[in-house]
């Protein structure tokens, strides 16, 4: 019978989607997503910092946030998805 609390013994562990192999795949997918998110954040930081250093004595440009807003939204959605996947793994 399946030992996971989600299925409460409804079938053999080999049939359960929560088997160790599946959890390992979810974990590696979440880690891959986290690595991609970190790379995206590093690239975004690099793109904004060289501009900030180039015009450090001038006023900040108001158009910088609308330029990167889609990237920030995408990064937030990916982070939420990774957190959701990790939360489901700990059930």
UniProtKB/Swiss-Prot annotation:
Keyword line: Apoptosis, Membrane, Mitochondrion, Transmembrane, Transmembrane helix
Q: Where is this motif: BH3?
A: 33-47
From what superkingdom does this record's organism come?
Eukaryota
Membrane topology classification: Single-pass membrane protein
- Gene Ontology cellular component list: membrane; mitochondrion
Against PROSITE patterns, the record matches this protein to: BH3
Pfam families linked to this entry: Harakiri (PF15196)
**Tell me, what is an example of a GO biological process annotation in this record?**
positive regulation of release of cytochrome c from mitochondria
Spans through the membrane = 69-87
Localisation per UniProt entry: Membrane; Mitochondrion
| Subcellular location, principal | membrane
What's in the domain note?
A: The BH3 motif is required for the induction of cell death.
Q: What does this protein do?
A: Promotes apoptosis.
Q: Which proteins does it associate with, and in what oligomeric form?
A: Interacts with BCL2 and BCL2L1. Interacts with C1QBP.
Please state what the protein is called.
Activator of apoptosis harakiri
Which species is the source of this protein?
Homo sapiens (Human)
Q: What is the lineage of its organism?
A: Eukaryota, Metazoa, Chordata, Craniata, Vertebrata
**Which gene is the coding source of this polypeptide chain?**
HRK
